């Protein structure tokens, strides 16, 4: 199929969202849908557990939207969720993560 990132960039309303973890480290994550802007607010703090749970909902919806539109799921949303879960595992569920910004 070729470069799937290029495919999504041309056809899917994608967004990057930047987070600051409780230890001060920052990380950017990809969503193949703008759904994250409906569930999160830039500049807001979230307990790690809530951030992970809400991200899971967003990535599931994003995957469904890609599947409905193109007939296949989105590997990028699965990879995003894996990255979020891996990073979040370093912190207590009640620690705060900040969603710093959305980038289109």
Report each predicted region and the residues it spans.
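Motif-centric detector for short Cys/His coordination patterns
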Residues: 2-104
């Amino acid at each position: 199929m070729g470069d799937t990132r290029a495919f999504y960039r041309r056809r899917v309303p994608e967004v990057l969202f930047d987070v600051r973890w409780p230890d001060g480290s920052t990380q950017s994550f990809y969503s193949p849908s703008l759904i994250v802007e409906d569930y999160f607010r830039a500049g807001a703090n979230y307990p790690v557990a809530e951030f992970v749970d809400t991200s899971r909902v967003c990535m599931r919806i994003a995957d469904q939207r890609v599947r409905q539109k193109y007939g296949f799921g989105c590997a990028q949303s699965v990879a995003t969720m894996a990255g979020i879960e891996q990073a979040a595992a370093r912190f207590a569920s009640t620690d705060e993560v900040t969603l710093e910004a959305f980038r289109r």
